[in-house]
Amino acid sequence: MWLEGYSSLSYVNDWRDAFAGSPRLSADLCNINDLLDMPRFMRRIRDYDLVVVLHSAAGDSMRQVRRATAALDSRRGPLVVFFGNEYAGMTEKIGFARDVGAEFIASQLPIESARWLYAACNPARVLASPAALNPTVYKTAEGPRTIDIGFRGVLYAHPFALGDEERTDLLRFFVEGARSWDLVTDISFERYAAAEWAAFLNRCRGVVGAESGTYYLERDDATRRAVIEYVGQHPNATFDEVFELFFARYSNPVSGKAISSRHFEPVGTKTCQILLEGDYNGILQADRDYISLSKDYSNIDDVVRRFRDDGYRSALVDHALDHVLAEHTYTHRVNRVLDEVL
């Protein structure tokens, strides 16, 4: 089950295509936004040995997939739910998983954080299912790389509610410092569809980024809702003000910082990544698969020096691609899920 309309969020289509193309499955795709398609598939729900709800159907809104609750209750095979945006709307998402008795929840989060987040969904098993690479779309192309540091992307909705501005501050830092480092930058806040994004990456020698998500996972969205309400009432509030009020004394936070598809796509195009130090689900290794920048930027001179070294940069992107192609494509991810659930 998926939802059409996410052409600029390529990972949701990459997961769909990987399941649909798996030689281990004979898969039917149900677009839950199709008023004819959806009821037809729900009437046949008992015909299926496995039911998968993908991120697009259980991400921004649960309204459409909720219409399938009664049908899902009558399924014969196990249900795997992939939730998108695991930093928002978690009350509804956890409630859905419990109401339909999902046997498996596939999470993009580091596994211990995911188990904490979905503890109320017991006995559902939580599967580590982070993003991956689609090597048929994200691959190298002929042509010059005229941009040193590039970026295309959009800001999170309600960014203050995440509790940090790491990526925004990082981009601002590179825009302001580019001239002194003699780097050509092309940084703007817009989202490209997959083919256009891949073409842009192939014009870039490098991109900058940070882990996705929040340091403050919550099962009930209490802090997120409070921040959104506060900012709505105080539209001129600064991030520092919001952080001091809602996050500075936050007790025992559980981090939901994670690797995302945006960290795999440059690997496919051999575009060097300069990333803020982080764990990246233990998949990408600092200074082997990307150049690691300290969170206080204290090693920026060394980072720029290494980035400008063509030989170093070439060896790094080659290593990253070999590593990811060996273990971290969407084909690998789907096979691992199927190994667990069938």
List the predicted regions and their residue ranges.
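Conserved donor-binding/catalytic core segment of Leloir-type glycosyltransferases
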Residues: 143-162
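Active-site donor-binding acidic/aromatic loop of nucleotide-activated sugar
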Residues: 184-190, 210
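Extended catalytic core of nucleotide-activated donor transferases of GT-like folds
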Residues: 1-122, 134-138
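Glycine- and acidic-residue-enriched helix-capping/strand-helix junction motifs
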Residues: 5-12, 158-168
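Catalytic binding pocket for nucleotide-activated donors in carbohydrate/polymer assembly enzymes
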Residues: 1-32, 80-81, 98, 196-342
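A conserved nucleotide-sugar
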Residues: 168-186
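Aromatic-residue-lined binding/catalytic grooves and analogous aromatic/hydrophobic interfacial grooves
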Residues: 124-131
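Acidic anion/phosphate-binding donor-loop and adjacent secondary structure
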Residues: 132-145, 195-196
